[in-house]
Amino acid sequence: NLYQFKNMIHCTVPNRSWWHFANYGCYCGRGGSGTPVDDLDRCCQIHDNCYGEAEKISGCWPYIKTYTYDSCQGTLTSCGAANNCAASVCDCDRVAANCFARAPYIDKNYNIDFNARCQ
């Protein structure tokens, strides 16, 4: 779920608050469209698509589904989720949080003009 995703982000990118990722580029935060502006935005596009795939599982709502995962030490290695939905959502979040840790954060891509740059 989004709360657990926030915690995963804090694990992998401890020097930056989760909300820095909530309004970044074309895909981090509110939906998404257009071409990702950079590698970090591409991480968010992949995460959005992953949630879309998880939603195809009957009764799976990624934004609120809880799951378990290994404790954090810089890299999140595995999800301990017990069912397909929880495992899928956890893996979406784990992959994205690790992707965020590898991708450079470019300040000018935070809070961009969505209508002008993301069509």
UniProtKB/Swiss-Prot annotation:
Positions annotated as active site in the UniProt record: 47, 93
State the CDD domains in the record: PLA2c
Tissue expression profile of the protein = Expressed by the venom gland.
In which broad location class does this protein mainly occur, judging by the first location in its UniProt entry? Answer: secreted
**Enzyme class, spelled out:** hydrolase
Disulphide bond pairs: 11-72, 26-118, 28-44, 43-99, 50-92, 60-85, 79-90
Return the GO cellular component terms, semicolon-separated: extracellular region
Q: Does the keyword Transmembrane apply?
A: no
Q: Which reaction does it catalyse?
A: a 1,2-diacyl-sn-glycero-3-phosphocholine + H2O = a 1-acyl-sn-glycero-3-phosphocholine + a fatty acid + H(+)
Q: Which PANTHER family does the record associate with it? A: PHOSPHOLIPASE A2 A2-ACTITOXIN-UCS2A-LIKE, PHOSPHOLIPASE A2 FAMILY MEMBER
Mind telling me what this protein is named?
Acidic phospholipase A2 DE-III
Lineage, highest ranks first:
Eukaryota, Metazoa, Chordata, Craniata, Vertebrata
